[in-house]
Amino acid sequence: MESTSSPELLQMARWLAGDFSNQEQAWENPPFFASIRVAYRPLPTAVLGGIGFYVEQAYSGHLEEPYRQAVVELTQVGDGIVIRNYRPLQPQRWRGCARGRAEQLSQLSAADLAYLPGCDVQVKRQGSLFVGVTEPGCRCCVVRNGQTTYLQTTLHLSENEFCSHDRGMDPVTHRQVWGAVAGPFRFRKVVDWQAELLQ
């Protein structure tokens, strides 16, 4: 692993590298939480020049049809970590690569990605957790059902659990328009890919 990566950055990357499921939460509270899988597949170092992940989020019964595809980059900024978010310009080309066709990710390059300004997540270590929130400024724009909103993300990451809460907020009233109303999704790691980091 690169000597320029801090111990905390590497620790967060190890904990994030994997396939996560909220099956237990979905069983406990089916009216509010669908059964979802979210995969953070480590990218070859050459793609972003450091620690990056290809991300797919899908309903558990339809892993081959992800409803969210993204690329994230972990960087050290001061005494914290920043998660930079990108969207693939041709998402169909990479569909399924988080699980079944991971070797194809070696063909991914920065030219295949569009950076999402205002959508960085600022992360701090708090005891045994990494805690992150969307950067200030309400600039991470998301259009949902024809309505412009801004994304507000919070996340908690521990060794085996990843909790996230994405909410779309009205830019005028700052009230929630979309997203889980019953609190964050709680994902448990079911597959570990940390051995693939920084290859």
From Swiss-Prot:
InterPro entries: CpcT/CpeT, CpcT/CpeT_sf. Gene3D superfamilies: CpcT/CpeT domain. It is an enzyme of class 4 (lyase). Transmembrane segments: none annotated. It comes from the Bacteria. Its EC number is 4.-.-.-. Keywords: Lyase. One of its GO terms (molecular function) is lyase activity. HAMAP family: Chrphore_lyase_CpxT (MF_01460). Belongs to the CpcT/CpeT biliprotein lyase family. Covalently attaches a chromophore to Cys residue(s) of phycobiliproteins. This is Chromophore lyase CpcT/CpeT 2.
